[in-house]
């Protein structure tokens, strides 16, 4: 229960301006952040699978935005050595333009929201804003979008965040808890994202990741069905057609090293045994659904950029439909170290005894609708998050990004991030701090430019280091 009145919460937000003026958010002083970025990066690699560390370096060296995606430990240190507002909420922790995406809700709707919470933790609300704003600059540069359009996208994002937070601060609690954004289908790149999500069925993932047990080539899936037809028939018709084309033979994971490798023997038994503990973290009715699936095979998978080198297993399960593989479920069992922000926050490192539990709770707090199979488990004293690998998931394609789409997408990012922060924090205090004018917006735009430039310098330093140490990127 919140013991403060609405007026007291507003006063708390206004008082925070004395601790950190809104105009001060423009400051990024590299000289007061003594940590060596590459040393922080190397430290974050400790405990990871050594043979995969070069893969992470390769992905980070591909572009400044690729570097940014894998450099949360660096940005966490840089944010922490500057003053903050002290207005805490649940952070996404890795808020950037590719960490929002579409996925299937339990009621079969395709929804769109923040969707990566490996770094989630309670922290100053502005840290998420600064990271996402910087990502808009870097993504815009990578897509070849003009500076004026990049700046307008960042301004649009922050303005929408501020105005949405003001709206949420005056909204009844249950209305906020249920708040949905209904204009999604008409925003910038969203039609393409939703079309991709409709096509990204479990059966298509089955064909991509598995093969018949005898090793013969799988029959190709029929031509892609138009998005509208898939939307109308996804529950019955399209699934039946896809299953028919895949065939009736038993299946197992393909071997595509180092990105996908089958796990067998004692190692596979450890992973499967961990599903029992995981099941206890699900709600009772979802435990019932899970119990109707039978594990078939286990693999080790490399995903993303920031997570490369962490232990990441995939379990292929089959349901009761016939043939059994026409009812696949893929569970990702993903190692979760402590959040990169934890060391810089009061009690951050001690707040959670299980890092998978931390991620699950942070995700549920910020999302309107979460993966119905979201849970956690432990393998060999390491903490893991469990979720569906891909159930109608889709996201932004930087290769097709244009200025008009970036503006609309930035606007959506602002509203979704504000909703997540309002659900898990004090919207009244945050809104009172931000105020009704553009002072915070303009300052944060300045920060985003400065930090994007700093990221490019760090990226260049990584590339030069890899040239001097070619074995570090030799996978």
What role is predicted for each listed range?
Residues 4-92, 97-201, 225-231, 278-475:
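Conserved ATP-binding subdomain of kinase catalytic cores across diverse folds
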Residues 197-224, 228, 232-307, 316:
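Acidic catalytic cores of enzymes that act on phosphate-bearing nucleotides/polynucleotides
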